[in-house]
């Protein structure tokens, strides 16, 4: 984290990232605990939605978040937008709760039992391989490579799920198997207009290509080392805890904005019988999405909730990116407050 030349800097209690800055073991503990919290939310909220789900009302008009996603994956015996076999959703929810406990225990184990700094482990040990310094591009890209490979495997799992089990097709109102369309021309052309994609086969083709791309990229980052000018290309002299955090926040903000507009306008990936009608973009104090369907007062579709929440979370993540990017570049925000204090205390004298 940025210290502005002060070797004995202290951080406030709310600066949570500072606790893992130079302690790679604590960093892993925080990751595991965070994943456990997300798992717990998903499981608990799915059970909450199941308890209030009414099959006589369109799913998109019931302010649901988790159930439409599960239905879109073909879980719950969905037919014409109605869940007919909620047992499958219950199983998924309970599994998430169980795994959340496992991940939470892993976070506590890494935090309380194992070394806070993986660098304290013997040379050549598996734990030592994942120790890192924030300004070491070799070790950071080694870890990045593993992340990319697991993301690629996740894409493969999704593609195979659609091919073998099937996903929900709103055009037919049933769950059907979907084979991927690995048309590179289609994938290239959808780089700019992916919001308009209207074929599940094309969606799966994009994920299949992305899986290949991610795994190749992961292997590349694991295998390559610093060499000549490539050292600077990997970020030598640019990397720090603050800068890596800013890059991550920028990526999350981008994903949130894409999800917001995709959910608001696309009915292939976000079917109307699961999420409600498409939205309209309005501008007042700030941009926001509004429902186009006739709904009771103060009622909103699942599409409206998802799109607006993603949009505003993306906005605040973007502000966090700018904040940490400027700090990583050396800008001291305390100077802003000092400048205002100097303006208030300045005396104007007649010439």
From Swiss-Prot:
The keyword RNA-binding does not apply. Signal peptide: none annotated. It is found in: Cellular thylakoid membrane. Keywords: Chlorophyll, Chromophore, Membrane, Photosynthesis, Photosystem I, Photosystem II, Thylakoid, Transmembrane, Transmembrane helix. GO terms for biological process: photosynthetic electron transport chain. Its main location: membrane. Induction: This transcript is expressed at a very low level between 4.5 and 72 umol blue light/m2/s. The whole antenna complex is most highly expressed under low light; as the light levels increase antenna complex levels decrease. Thus at least in this strain the amount of antenna complex is controlled mostly at a post-transcriptional level. The transcript is also strongly induced in response to iron-starvation. The chain crosses the membrane at residues 27-47, 64-84, 89-109, 203-223, 244-264, 306-326. One of its GO terms (cellular component) is plasma membrane-derived thylakoid membrane. Its cofactor is divinyl chlorophyll a; divinyl chlorophyll b. It is a multi-pass membrane protein. The keyword Heme does not apply. One of its GO terms (molecular function) is chlorophyll binding. Belongs to the PsbB/PsbC family. IsiA/Pcb subfamily. The antenna complex functions as a light receptor, it captures and delivers excitation energy to photosystems II and I. The Prochlorales pcb genes are not related to higher plant LHCs. This low-light-adapted strain contains 8 pcb genes. The antenna complex consists of divinyl chlorophylls (a and b) and divinyl chlorophyll a/b binding proteins and binds more divinyl chlorophyll b than does the antenna complex from high-light-adapted Prochlorococcus. This is Divinyl chlorophyll a/b light-harvesting protein PcbC. The gene is pcbC.
């Amino acid at each position: 984290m940025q210290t502005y030349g002060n070797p004995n800097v202290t951080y406030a209690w709310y600066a949570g990232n500072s606790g893992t800055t130079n302690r790679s073991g604590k960093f892993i503990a925080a990751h595991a605990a965070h994943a456990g919290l997300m798992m717990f939310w998903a499981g608990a909220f799915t059970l909450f939605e199941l308890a209030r789900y009414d099959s006589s009302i369109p799913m998109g008009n019931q302010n649901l978040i988790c159930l439409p996603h599960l239905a879109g994956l073909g879980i719950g015996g969905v037919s014409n937008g109605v869940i007919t076999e909620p047992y499958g959703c219950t199983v998924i929810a309970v599994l998430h709760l169980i795994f959340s406990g496992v991940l939470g225990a892993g976070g506590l184990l890494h935090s309380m039992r194992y070394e806070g700094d993986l660098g304290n482990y013997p040379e050549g040990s598996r734990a030592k391989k994942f120790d890192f310094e924030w300004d070491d591009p070799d070790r950071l890209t080694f870890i990045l490579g593993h992340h990319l490979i697991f993301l690629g495997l996740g894409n493969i799992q999704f593609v195979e799920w659609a091919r073998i089990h099937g996903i929900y097709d709103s055009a037919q109102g049933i769950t059907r198997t979907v084979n991927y369309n690995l048309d590179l021309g289609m994938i290239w052309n959808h780089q700019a207009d992916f919001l308009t994609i209207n074929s599940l086969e094309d969606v799966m083709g994009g994920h299949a290509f992305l899986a290949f791309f991610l795994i190749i990229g992961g292997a590349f980052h694991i295998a390559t080392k610093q060499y000549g000018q490539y050292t600077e290309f990997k970020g030598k002299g640019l990397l720090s805890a603050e800068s890596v955090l800013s890059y991550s926040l920028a990526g999350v903000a981008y994903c949130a904005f894409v999800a917001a507009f995709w959910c608001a306008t696309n009915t292939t990936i976000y079917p109307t019988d699961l999420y409600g009608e498409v939205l309209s973009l309005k501008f007042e104090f700030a941009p926001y999405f509004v429902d186009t369907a006739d709904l009771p007062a103060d009622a909103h579709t699942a599409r409206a909730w998802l799109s607006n929440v993603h949009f505003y979370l993306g906005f605040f993540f973007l502000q966090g990116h700018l904040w940490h990017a400027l700090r990583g570049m050396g800008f001291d925000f305390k100077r802003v407050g000092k400048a205002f204090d100097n303006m208030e205390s300045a005396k104007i004298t007649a010439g």
